[in-house]
């Protein structure tokens, strides 16, 4: 999934269909998150796959290892390209998640699996006062990244601001998938650690996830092409 990943932050397939129709003939990388998946079920993935788009299924699993393993067996059968868990679930949970994907993958080739470190809506103060993690935000992200690597995962979800440090610690092949991407003309909304596609490329992101800058644009195709231009420059 080398192209910018478009976050399909919609509730209905009709909205998705209308949006994707604007990109007729183009193969996209898209993110199906909780809102869309929980509103429509697995059929939403099947319909998008029928259009040959790559899918990052963003459900952020976080439960006991056996439950996550069983859930991943089911998700693997959907044929998506990437899934994720919360690194806070621990090393054993992440190992179980990967094992579940390997068991459930019908073709023998499992989806990529990455772990969420800290949400891009979380500030250092939030983390320290609400999660009672007394390190710096960067130290927390780096710890979770290292734990994910030890568990055999393919990478992490992180802010672009931490991407270069993770690349140095865990290697260039370890994915650094970064949400919180906005075009310079857009607002940050509810995300705290936000950068442009160009800056994300320059400071070490391996993949970017872009939602509102594209889906809420007056001309989504033009906005996507602008993101693509900055990302590939």
Swiss-Prot record:
The active site is at residue 60. Substrate binds at residues 9, 31, 58-67, 120, 182, 191, 211-212. Pathway: Pyrimidine metabolism; UMP biosynthesis via de novo pathway; UMP from orotate: step 2/2. It is an enzyme of class 4 (lyase). Pfam families: OMPdecase. InterPro entries: Aldolase_TIM (IPR013785), OMPdecase (IPR014732), OMPdecase_AS (IPR018089), OMPdecase_bac (IPR047596), OMPdeCOase_dom (IPR001754), RibuloseP-bd_barrel (IPR011060). The keyword Lyase applies. CDD domains: OMP_decarboxylase_like. GO terms for molecular function: orotidine-5'-phosphate decarboxylase activity. Homodimer. Belongs to the OMP decarboxylase family. Type 1 subfamily. Catalyzes the decarboxylation of orotidine 5'-monophosphate (OMP) to uridine 5'-monophosphate (UMP). This is Orotidine 5'-phosphate decarboxylase. It comes from Listeria monocytogenes serovar 1/2a (strain ATCC BAA-679 / EGD-e). The lineage of its organism: Bacteria, Bacillati, Bacillota, Bacilli, Bacillales. The gene is pyrF.
